[in-house]
């Protein structure tokens, strides 16, 4: 079960979370393995977590490989729009290019435009929360990118990070259960 930290959400909303703390959260977003079945299980887990935490909110969830191959895609309720797909693409592109969550990069960007800070087109990249890299503890490169769109950007980010960490912890517990 994923329970969002309301105090952390308030801090994210007010931008009172240092980049180092955001990076520490990202470092906890790792899985020991990542198969097609893991992608499906993770996506289903996140869909259920979104439905529990944000009933009746239309949210799009995407898990894709760095090469763009989509392993999982769903929405929670009717009402998501094609615009969510565009947000997913732009957030995912940001996380994969810069190696950090799209929220982290938005905080790092500060008040500058993407063009000023990073020399990228804001029509192609989104510096808003929701895209988080799925990492391996054995590699410097991500397995995939998890992207959520449809909530406020801080909620998208916290839902992605919290769900991924909770899923990883539950998977580890299952792996360690020798019964």
Curated annotation (Swiss-Prot):
Its main location: cytoplasm. Disulfide bonds: none annotated. InterPro entries: PduO/GlcC-like, PduO/GlcC-like_sf, YBR137W-like. Keywords: Cytoplasm. The keyword Cell membrane does not apply. GO terms for biological process: post-translational protein targeting to endoplasmic reticulum membrane. It is found in: Cytoplasm. One of its GO terms (cellular component) is cytoplasm. Present with 1200 molecules/cell in log phase SD medium. Belongs to the UPF0303 family. This is UPF0303 protein YBR137W. It comes from Saccharomyces cerevisiae (strain ATCC 204508 / S288c).
């Amino acid at each position: 079960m994923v329970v969002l930290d309301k105090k952390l959400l308030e801090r994210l909303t007010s931008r009172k979370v240092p980049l180092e703390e955001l990076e520490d959260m990202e470092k906890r977003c790792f899985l020991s393995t990542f198969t097609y079945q893991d992608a499906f299980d993770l996506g289903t887990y996140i869909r259920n977590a979104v439905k529990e935490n944000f009933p009746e909110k239309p949210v799009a969830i995407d898990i894709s490989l760095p090469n763009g191959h989509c392993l999982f895609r769903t929405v929670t309720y009717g009402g998501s729009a094609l615009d969510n797909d565009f947000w997913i693409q732009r957030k995912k592109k940001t996380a994969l290019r810069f190696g950090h969550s799209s929220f982290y990069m938005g905080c790092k960007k500060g008040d500058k435009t993407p063009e000023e800070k990073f020399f990228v087109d804001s029509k192609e990249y989104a510096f808003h929360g929701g895209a988080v890299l799925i990492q391996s503890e054995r590699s410097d490169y991500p397995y995939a990118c998890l992207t959520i769109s449809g909530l406020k950007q801080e909620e998208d980010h916290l839902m992605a990070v919290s769900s991924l960490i909770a899923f990883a912890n539950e998977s580890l517990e299952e792996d360690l259960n020798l019964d």
